[in-house]
Each structure stands twice: as structure tokens, then as C-alpha cells.
Amino acid sequence: MVYDVRRSSAAASPAGHVRSREIMTIAVESPSQRARLRFREHPVEFLLGAFADVRPGEAPTVLLLTLNVFLLLTAYYLLKVAREPLILLGAGAEVKSYASVGQSLLLVFVASFYGWLSARVGRMALIASVTLFFAMNLAVFWALGIRGVSLGVPFFLWVGVFNTVTVAQFWSFAAETYTEEQGKRLFPIVGIGSSIGAVGGATIAEPLVRLGSPFLLMLVAAAILVSTVGLTYLVHRRNATLAATDSTKPQDAPLGRDNAFALIVRDRYLLIFAILIFVLNMVTKTGDYVLDRMLVSHARASAEALGIAPASYIGEFKARYFEWINTLGVILQLFVVSRVIKYAGLRVALILVPLASLAGYTTALAMPLIGVLFVGRVAESTLDYSLSNTTRQALWLVTSRDAKYKAKQVIDTFVMRAGDSVSAALVWFGTRAALGARAFLAVNVALSVAWAAMALLLGREHARRSEGSERFGAGRRFETAGRGAALRP
């Protein structure tokens, strides 16, 4: 589409006649033409645009990060499958239910050691050493397992530490890789790798178990972990030039010597963040317990009427439950998360999950039916694994390097497991006090209100922290829009 704009020259002849006339031709492309041009120039970014706002030159890094977290979650779900028969047959379901307390205690020392190490080595050395250490651990577990050594409890504790430490470390690295503006746009795509990795790991675990034993999964997971170190290095090298020319970004320098717990206590933003994660995990674990309790009771009654074993009934119910969560989670991550963050903002995205949780448990309290709780838990878990997870990772973009690595490790490991432990204690005391399912649902209604309050406070603190960068970004967008407006018809 071409427009001719004619204007008279300001200069005139002595007789007063117009001496010349300028003709300016402006080419204005239609939306379809612009789309075709962008596809020809940046095909990968154009295709990724269906899921988020990816700009020229950003595709390689975001795809490497997406593949990295995909592999991490694939490895975790392989190990999760390997863990179950070892703990259930070796120690029993009761030991498993209380093992989160042991994980919490263990993570105090792990988080402290991680903070100590991060202050003495560079970023790449930190990530590589931690990841390869876990990979070597798997080789040791495999060697012990094939010799008949009982691994149930040790391996269960180890998997809990491995998952929280490596995933938190990955998101710390991703948060340091991007600016706040980039992270808000691109983290939804990285989150796709997390969602699909969870599904992929669970899918390939079954045929691998048939090929050998749970110990084979350990070797496969170890190989996957080694490959993630290479992917991390590629992203690190892609950003090395920028880091070398920008003295404000000492990306591979060791961190400061501040204690991680002290960082959280001194910083209002981090303290609210920690409380939110603690309450969130209490709600989640207590909700899991109530659903399982109602399921067992329902299975015993329904299975007898249907003529099937209670174990089969529970297995089919759980398969359906996780299928709904995984499927809806991937759909939300692909098509909804980026748009909610872009158009509604992080504050709205942060509050949606506790509101869904509050609605679900309030409805279940009024109508304590397993079908009602099923729908509520699916909605809560789906939003938590997609929208809430991506939003929480984006909230770290405004923090310091020390906070991204040290404080995040404490919050995503120790604080998270502490919430699990307090929930386990609540269940222990509640069952011995003969509390019914409705009593636990009432507790979760109250906890959901506290969760929503923490989300509001955290959203407000985040808005204050990002205000300066948002003003700068708005000014840049205004200048760009102003230059572009001169060329529009």
C-alpha cells in the first residue's frame, strides 16, 4: 500500500509563484505484509510469537533455556518414578508421608553450604559443580542399588533435595540472564519446557522401567543432567560479550558473603515472598491429604459396589487426576500465561491462584463431595504449575544477584519443605484428634485467605521495586512510538 503526500515548498519565486513542489512517497505495509516480512527475516521468533512476545535475536537463548528446564524436569520425573517403589516397598507409605520433615532439616545444611560455595566460585562453576555432583550421586546410587543395598529412605530424601536445588538454581540463572522487561515476556516460553518436561519424564519412565529396573532410570537421569551443563554453558557464552562490556553486570563473579537467611530477614520483599511460599505449600499439602482421605473412603465404598479392587479404583482416579492437571497445565502455559502477564500484569497473575484455591475449598466445605474437591484441586494445581510458577519466577527479576541465588535457594528449598512439614504436623495432630475432612477444609479456607493477603502484599512490593525500570521502559516505548508515528498515514 503506497500513499503520495504532496506539500508546497516554503520557498517562492520573486513573482510569488511556487517554485517547486515536493512529492513524498510513504510505503505503508498492511498487517499481513508485515507478518510475511517478519517471518522471512526472523522465522523462529515469528513462530514463537504464537506463545509470547519474542523479538529479533532472542530466540536462541530462550530456546536453550527452554530445552534446559525441559531436561531438568524430565530427569526429575524419571527419578520420581524410580523413587516410589524403593520407598514404598522398602520403608512403607507412613515413612514416606513424614519424610518431608527430614528433607526440611537436611535442606537447612544444603542451603547454607550452597550460599558458602556461591560466595567463592563464579556462576558457571557453581552451576556446573552442583549439577555434576548430583549426576555423580546417581551413579553411586545405581552401583549400590544393583548390589541389593536398601535405598528407600536415603534416595527419597536425596530426590527431594535434588529437585528443589537444581530447579531453583536454573531459575536463578534465567533471572540473571534477562532484564525484568525481557523476563516478563520470555519466561512463559521457558515455562513451557517445564510443563512439557514433567509430562515427558512421566511418559518415558514406564517403558524404561520395563526394560530394566528403577536403577536404569538413575543412569538415564544422570546422562540428562550432564547434558544440561552444556546447555547452561552455551547460554553463558552467548551473554559473555554483554557482561564483559557492561561493568554493572559481573555475571560470573562470585557472590557476596551475606548469609542467605539474613538476606531474607532484612528484606521486606523477600520476607513476604518466603511467607507466601510457606503458606502456599501448606495449602497444597493439606489439600492433597484431604483429597486422598476422601478418595480412600470413596474407593472402599464404590469399589465394592462396582466389583473392583480399591487399589485399582484409586489408581484410575489418580491417573485421571494427573492427566487433567498435566494437559490443562500445558495448554495454559502455551496460550494463556504470557497473555495474562502481558495484559493483566504480575500483580493480577499472582492473586489468581489463591483466589481459585479459596473458591475451591469454600465450595468443597459447603458441599464435601469428592467430585467437587476433584475439580477444585485440578483448577488450583493447574494454575499453580503454569501461571503461578511462571509469575513467581518473574518476581525474582527485580532482586539482587545474591538474592537470586542465595535467598532463592532458601525459599525454594527449605521454606517450601518447611511448609510441607508443618502441614504434615497438622495432619498428624488432626488425625489423632479425630478431625473430619471438613475441619481440614476449613483450615485450608483460612490458609487460602492468608495466601491471598500475602499475594497482595508481594504484588504491591514488586510494583514499588519495578517502578523505576517501568518508567524508563515507558519512556523508551514513547520515543519509539513517536518516531514510528511520523511514518504512519
Residue locations for each model-derived region?
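Substrate-agnostic recognition of the 12-TM MFS/MFS-like secondary transporter fold
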Residues: 61-114, 151-209, 250-263, 268, ...
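Hydrophobic/aromatic positions within or immediately flanking transmembrane alpha-helices
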Residues: 97-100, 127-128, 187, 218-219, ...
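Small-residue-rich packing faces within the transmembrane alpha-helices of Major Facilitator Superfamily
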Residues: 108, 135-136, 226-229, 358-359, ...
